[in-house]
Regions:
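ABC transporter nucleotide-binding domain
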Residues: 176-258
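ABC transporter nucleotide-binding domains
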Residues: 10, 17-191, 196-197, 201-204
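Structural motif detector for alpha-helix initiation sites
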Residues: 99, 220, 285-288
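Short, charged/small-residue-rich alpha-helical element at the C-terminal edge
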Residues: 229-298
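Residues at or immediately preceding the N-termini of alpha-helices
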Residues: 61, 73, 77, 220, ...
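Residues that scaffold the ATP/ADP-binding catalytic core of kinase and kinase-like folds
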Residues: 76, 223, 291, 295
Length: 298
């Protein structure tokens, strides 16, 4: 994703943020393109929320430039901010008001018609909860409401901060599907998380932030492929350990780690040539968190 084939929705150039003598962000630069989901990854205090607040205009950057749909945030903030939707904090909800009342307030503020209210109420999937006060909502319901409100004006870019916090597995699954729907309908997404595995099968790219600096950028497909792990049931596991340097045994089960499809094919050929019978082989869910821990250790 990206390159010259896609429109640049967001461009962050050399952005720094300093409060007194503390440099919270240090020369951050990246771009987000049309129909792309990008994850901002890092531990608590890395600077994820700060860069998001700079992009949404909640914080003023000390240095750098931010462009949203070709509008300069500093010199033309009104037009720049019209192109983004923000889903950052639940406190933006009024606890005594219902979901339906929130949609009406947002529609009035954005000058939207009743048809758009109906569309986004349906998208929120709140059902009977639409007419209950939000103080009685579950975390999942609050997240769906905040997300739908952020999408009311069909923004080109959605900013969403740690969306899975406090959600149960079903709510996370539902949220992931909604984010993919949003992307497929033409909105790019920048979301933050401190868990790399949350981006699996969702994001196109991951931006890794540590101590206010962008330390690495990775394509998610490449990241998964380069760390593929396979579980094998074979006739002679100990012999495989001698044949393949990329194999290991964990809890009495044989695994093989491959950095490419070519290495995977070569490894299988070695087993066949040495008369090792492979009874079963399965790709294990990518251990992205191990990669994350290795990147941030020390």
């Amino acid at each position: 994703m990206g390159g010259n084939l896609y429109m640049e929705i967001l461009k962050v150039e050399g952005v720094s943020k300093q409060i007194k003598n503390h440099r919270i962000l240090d020369n951050i630069s990246f771009s987000i393109f049309e129909n792309e989901i990008v994850g901002l990854i890092g531990p608590n205090g890395a600077g994820k929320s700060t860069i998001m607040k700079c992009i949404t205009g909640l914080y003023h950057m000390s240095e750098g430039k931010i462009t949203i749909c070709e509008y300069d945030l500093k010199s033309d903030s009104s037009n720049a901010l019209k192109n983004i939707g923000v889903s950052i904090e639940y406190p933006s909800l009024y606890p005594e008001l219902s979901g339906h009342e929130h949609f009406k307030i947002m529609a009035n503020w954005k000058h939207l018609d009743s048809k758009r209210i109906e569309e986004m109420e349906q998208f929120s999937d709140l059902k009977d909860g639409l007419y209950r006060a939000t103080e009685h909502y579950s975390m999942g319901m609050k997240q769906r409401l905040v997300l739908a409100l952020a999408m009311m004006s069909k923004p080109k870019l959605l900013i969403i901060d740690e969306p899975t916090n406090g959600l149960d597995p079903q709510a996370i699954f539902d949220l992931r599907n909604k984010l993919l729907t949003i992307r497929n309908e033409g909105t790019s997404i920048l979301l933050s998380s401190h868990q790399l595995s949350e981006l699996d099968k969702l994001a196109d790219r991951a931006l890794f932030i540590k101590s206010g600096k962008l330390i690495k950028e990775k394509n998610m497909d490449e990241l998964r492929q380069n760390h593929s792990i396979y579980r094998l049931e074979v006739s002679n596991p100990k012999n495989v350990l001698l044949l393949l340097k990329n194999s290991f045994i964990k809890e009495h089960i044989l695994y093989m780690q491959c950095d490419s499809k070519e290495e995977f094919s070569k490894s299988l050929q070695i087993l066949i040539q040495n008369d090792v019978l492979v009874y079963s082989l399965a790709e294990v869910h990518q251990d992205l968190e191990t990669y994350y821990k290795e990147l941030y250790k020390g």
